[in-house]
Regions:
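Binuclear metal-dependent hydrolase catalytic cores
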Residues: 1-164, 169, 174-176
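Cap/insert and terminal regions of metallo-dependent hydrolase folds
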Residues: 170-206
Length: 206
């Protein structure tokens, strides 16, 4: 399991931090956790190819975690890429299919992909859920941000695990997902002196 933080920022643009996204290489798969603005370019900077992404896992629907879906779909339509692109899966909170249709609507056909190319897996938002994939399992739990927000625990076949959450306040869901995990990655959106209930600060995340 190899992990690369492509972006550790927030909705506020910063020269030194890109928006949230993490690349995980696992069991021969490339998994993207969130896809905030600039993620496709960050992949290129890191020497990774967006066309090699097998799974995109989305924590919630705010723009700083989803905006580069637009770039990703449009870039995937580039004919030399589209001809050789293998199928990929988007794993996201319940309601994602509707969200995606609304996101694509202003662009018309320019974000459309062949049906064979993309599948989606919607996870329950009001309770824990899990999905098994080739070589790993994704467990999810509701977290304290929006009604659709989820935290995740990814476990490979050897038992290694990583827990990830985008924006969240302290909640039992993330505590349980993180229990005995090998690595925990949490978004801490505010400094300690500006802490709010639905987003962690460094002290709250620690």
């Amino acid at each position: 399991m190899n992990i690369l933080i492509l972006g550790s920022g927030t909705s506020v643009p910063l020269a030194e931090r890109a928006s949230p996204s993490i690349a995980i290489s696992l069991e021969g798969h490339l998994i993207l956790m969130d896809i905030g603005p600039g993620t496709v370019r960050q992949l290129a900077v890191a020497g990774l190819k967006y066309q090699d992404i097998d799974y995109i896992v989305i924590s919630h629907f705010h723009p700083d975690h989803t905006a580069d879906l637009i770039h990703f779909f449009f870039a995937t339509r580039y004919p030399p890429v589209l001809e050789e692109r293998k199928p990929f899966t988007i794993v996201a909170p319940k309601g994602f299919d509707q969200f995606l249709e609304l996101l694509k609507k202003p662009y018309g056909r320019w974000l459309d992909l062949p049906e064979r190319l993309m599948s989606t897996e919607e996870l329950k938002t009001g309770e824990n859920d899990s999905r098994e994939f080739d070589g790993f399992t994704i467990h999810s739990a509701p977290v304290n941000h929006t009604p659709q927000s989820l935290g995740f625990r990814i476990e490979d076949n050897s038992g290694k695990s990583i827990t990830y959450s985008g924006d969240t306040g302290y909640c039992e869901g993330i505590v349980e997902l993180a229990r005995d995990a090998d690595l925990l990655i949490l978004e801490c959106s505010f400094p300690d002196e500006e802490a709010i209930a639905r987003a962690l600060d460094p002290i709250g995340g620690g």
